[in-house]
């Protein structure tokens, strides 16, 4: 309510001033949700607070109120994660994967990856992802090639293509079925365990096939793989040493 009121009349914190302690108020909301393991529909709450102010006759002149307040809360979430020594690129990647209504999920996902990124699980995830992403980026760069994120199993030439598609579908099914009680370590472990199938594909399949249809189909497969990883957390934004 306080945040909506001040943002509504454009009394937002600046880089040097925060006379109404709005940063502290926003950080309090973040801490309340995370430390009590709660999710809340922040967008609905902002909309409700706006309607309360207007019903009481307050003039809210800021037309970008909701968007600016959401950005402000996510910035405070980033600050909170920095306090917890979560890498900034991991924090941003997690934020980019979800909206403000999933603050607790954003934090837990980032925290878990931050703890595992330099361990074998993290190394396996990124070696698999980068190998696929690098080939995909190289083939799509400055070329007239449009992919549809679907692949045609009918023109697969070997078992390695079939196995990769099967693994992608297994991962997608897992992520579709997880709920708010997600085991974040298990989720990352599942991604890491895909390395064997992914590397077998690259070791035995020539993506840049002479047949353009087969080549495109294999690139579609790689795009599906990368999007499956990115739908969990935006791995493309994370730096690897």
Each model region followed by its residue ranges:
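Amphipathic alpha-helical "coupling" segments that flank catalytic cores
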Residues: 1-241
């Amino acid at each position: 309510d306080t945040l909506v009121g001040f943002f509504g009349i454009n009394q937002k914190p600046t880089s040097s001033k925060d006379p109404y302690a709005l940063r502290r108020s926003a950080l309090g909301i973040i801490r309340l949700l995370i430390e009590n393991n709660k999710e809340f529909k922040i967008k609905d709450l902002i909309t409700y607070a706006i309607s309360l102010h207007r019903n009481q006759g307050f003039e809210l002149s800021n037309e970008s109120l909701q968007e600016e307040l959401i950005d402000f809360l996510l910035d405070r979430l980033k600050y909170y994660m920095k306090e917890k020594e979560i890498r900034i690129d991991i924090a941003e990647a997690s934020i980019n994967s979800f909206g403000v209504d999933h603050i607790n999920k954003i934090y837990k996902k980032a925290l878990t990856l931050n703890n595992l990124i330099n361990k074998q699980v993290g190394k396996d995830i990124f070696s698999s992802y980068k190998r696929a992403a690098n080939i995909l980026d190289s083939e799509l760069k400055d070329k007239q090639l449009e992919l549809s994120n679907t692949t045609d199993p009918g023109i697969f030439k070997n078992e390695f293509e079939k196995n990769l598609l099967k693994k992608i579908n297994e991962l997608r099914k897992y992520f579709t079925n997880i709920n708010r009680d997600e085991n974040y370590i298990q989720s990352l472990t599942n991604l890491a365990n895909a390395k064997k199938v992914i590397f077998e594909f690259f070791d035995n399949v020539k993506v840049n096939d002479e047949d353009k249809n087969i080549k495109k189909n294999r690139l579609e497969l790689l795009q599906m793989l990368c999007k499956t990883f990115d739908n969990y957390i935006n791995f493309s934004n994370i730096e690897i040493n």
